[in-house]
Amino acid sequence: MNWRDIIYSNPNIYGGKPVFRNSRITVEMVLDLMAAGWTLEQMSDEFPGILPEHVPAAAAFAAEMIHDEQALASSRARAA
């Protein structure tokens, strides 16, 4: 599964924060719930718009953002 298939950003929705397609559920919210120890069942019960594929997509999105940030930091360090 490619997170790009279900996560996107629109400047008119939450100021451009990444959200899941066909919803106003932010990736940030799902990651926060995951970090707080919520299960998928708890998330879905409390927020019916959260789907099973949202959890791995949010994790993949976060991992890629970290990799990109590390690459950028490394590039900056070499340039300095």
Walk through the language-model features, giving the residues of each.
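Basic, low-complexity segments
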Residues: 1-15
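Long, charge-rich, low-complexity alpha-helical segments
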Residues: 25-80
